[in-house]
C-alpha cells in the first residue's frame, strides 16, 4: 500500500494563506483527525471552514479543508488541502499534526513523482512542472506551460 505523504505546499514566509497538502490512502482519515468540525460524510471538492487542532485538541488556526477523491487529483491519490493563515508557525504545527495522524513528510518532488507513477503525467509533463516552478521570466513560464499541456512548440 502506498504511503500517505504531506508537505507545506506554499513558500514559507509571512502571507495571507498557506497550504499543507496531504496525498495518499489515509488523507481523509487525517482530515477527520485534525479538522475539528469535520462532518461524518465529507463531500469531495467541497470547501469546509473550521479549525485545525493538534492531537490534544488544542486549536492551531482557522482553516478551510478540501478533500479531493482519487483518481481525479493531481497525484491520482486521495488528496486533502488545508488552507490556513500563512504563518510559518501555524503551517508547521498543522504539518506536525498531519504527520502525527499517520502521514510522513514528502520528499522534494514526490507529489509530482506520484502523479507520474500513477499515470496522471507523462515524463515530459513532469519535467514541465519542474520548469514551471523554477521559471524566472515569462518566456520560460510560457514554454513550460505549453509543455505541461501537451504542446512541444
Regions found by a protein language model. Give the residues of each.
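A glycine-rich (often HGG/GG-containing) alpha/beta subdomain
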Residues: 1-142, 146-150
Amino acid at each position: 500500500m502506498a504511503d500517505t505523504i504531506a508537505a507545506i505546499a506554499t513558500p514559507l514566509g509571512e502571507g495571507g494563506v498557506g497550504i499543507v497538502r496531504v496525498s495518499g490512502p489515509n488523507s481523509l482519515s487525517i482530515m477527520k483527525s485534525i479538522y475539528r468540525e469535520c462532518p461524518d460524510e465529507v463531500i469531495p471538492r467541497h470547501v469546509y471552514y473550521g479549525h485545525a487542532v493538534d492531537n490534544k485538541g488544542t486549536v492551531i488556526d482557522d482553516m478551510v479543508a478540501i478533500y479531493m477523491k482519487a483518481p481525479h487529483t493531481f497525484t491520482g491519490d486521495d488528496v486533502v488541502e488545508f488552507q490556513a493563515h500563512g504563518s510559518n508557525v501555524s503551517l508547521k504545527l498543522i504539518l506536525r499534526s498531519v504527520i502525527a495522524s499517520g502521514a510522513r513528510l514528502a520528499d522534494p518532488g514526490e507529489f509530482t513523482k506520484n502523479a507520474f507513477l500513477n499515470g496522471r503525467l507523462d515524463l515530459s509533463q513532469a519535467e514541465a512542472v519542474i520548469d514551471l516552478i523554477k521559471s524566472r521570466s515569462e518566456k520560460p513560464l510560457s514554454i513550460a506551460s505549453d509543455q505541461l499541456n501537451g504542446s512541444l512548440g
